[in-house]
C-alpha cells in the first residue's frame, strides 16, 4: 500500500518516513510523492497521518527533515539532484520536531561592556569592563553590583548555589581570579579567596562538574588549576590567627600549572574531572590529562580559536574563529584535526559559543556582527534562528540554564531570550 502526493507530469519518488521520536511515528509503509515536494507539504502529510491514527499532537507540531543526517531546506528532488542521489531507490527520510523559536524576554542594562555571563537556576552572573560583577534575577531585577577587580572581568562561573548561599568565581585582566561567597537572603557578598599566579590577564574560567576545581586560561599562555574550596587551603576550622591571616591575605596559589600553548588561551572546558580542553590564539585546541600533567592530544587549525564549547551529550567540540566561521570537531576521532562541519552565517569575528545542556544537536554563538545565532549542528549552511537585539559586538553567550539563552555585548547589555521546550522533550 502506498500513499500518493502527485501532480501532472512530475517525477516520482518512493519515500520511507521515519522518526526516532516514537510519539510522532506514522505507519511504516512506502509513500509515493512527486519529486519537488516541499517541506510544507511533507508537514501536512505527517500531521494528516498522525490525525488519522488518533495522535493528540496532530496539528500542534511542525517538523524538519533530514536525509543522511543533513537538513533538507529545499524541495526534496532538488536536494537529491545536488547531492547526486538516485531517484530510483527508496528515499529514507527522517523527520524531527522543529525546535520552537526562542522569544526575547529582557534587556539588562549595565554601565559598561558585558564580557562574561553565566546563569544558574534563577540567577544571572555577569562580568563587565568597568571591573565589576553583577547579579540579576532571570526576571530582570538587579540584585547586586560587586567591585573588587582592578581591570575588566573576562570570565565568570558559578560554583554552587542554594537558597542560602552562592559561591562563584571571576577571572580578570588584572591577572587574578577571585572566589566569592554570596549570602542570598542578606544579599551581601565577600571575596573569600584571591587566586594569584598568572603573569598576564586571565581570559577564561570554568569549574569542573563536581565543582571541586576550576581551570583558568591566560594571556601568559598558561593553564592553571585551582581549588574551589572557600576555606583557606582546605582548613575546616581555622584558628583565630589563621582567620586573621585569611582576612588580610586571602591569597591562593594554583594546584597545578600546565604549559603547552604558545599564545593566549581563549577558552577552557572540562570534559571530566581529570580531562580538560582549551582553545588558543596559537591555532590549536589541546586536550589535557591532569593525571599525566600534560597534553593528551591536540587539534590544529588554520586560524586562531577565540572560544570553544564541549558537549557532554554528544562528546563534540564546537570552536569559534576570527574568519567568521564555527567548526565542529570530534576529539575521540583518529582524524581529530579534520573538521566535521563548518558553520557559515556570521559576517564578522565569532567571539563566543555554547552548547545546549539538554539537546545534543543545538548550540548558540555570538559575534562582532551584533548577532546571536542558534544552530543545529546538522544544518551547517544556516542557523535555525537569529536572536536579534544587540546594537554592538556580542562578547559572550551562555545556555547553562536550558530555559534561557543569554548574551552580553559592547552595547552594555545582556539580552535574555526565553528558550521554549519542544513538545517531544516535555515530560
Swiss-Prot record:
- Residues crossing the lipid bilayer are none
Q: Where in the cell is it found?
A: Nucleus, Nucleolus; Nucleus, Nucleoplasm
Q: What does the record give under GO molecular function?
A: ribonucleoprotein complex binding
UniProt GO BP: maturation of 5.8S rRNA from tricistronic rRNA transcript (SSU-rRNA, 5.8S rRNA, LSU-rRNA); maturation of LSU-rRNA from tricistronic rRNA transcript (SSU-rRNA, 5.8S rRNA, LSU-rRNA)
Taxonomy, superkingdom: Eukaryota
> Which InterPro entries does UniProt cross-reference here?
G-protein_beta_WD-40_rep, NLE, WD40/YVTN_repeat-like_dom_sf, WD40_repeat_CS, WD40_repeat_dom_sf, WD40_rpt, WDR12/Ytm1
Q: Where are the WD repeats?
A: 109-146, 148-190, 197-236, 260-298, 301-339, 345-385, 389-427
Identify the Pfam families for this entry. Answer: NLE, WD40
Which segments carry the region annotation Ubiquitin-like (UBL) domain?
A: 13-97
User: One cellular component GO annotation, for this chain's record?
Assistant: PeBoW complex
* Coiled-coil region: none
Q: Which keywords fit this entry according to its UniProt record?
A: Nucleus, Repeat, Ribosome biogenesis, rRNA processing, WD repeat
Per the record, the similarity remark reads:
Belongs to the WD repeat WDR12/YTM1 family.
Task: Report the function annotation for this chain.
Answer: Required for maturation of ribosomal RNAs and formation of the large ribosomal subunit.
Q: What is this protein called?
A: Ribosome biogenesis protein WDR12 homolog
Naturally occurring in which organism (per UniProt)? Aedes aegypti
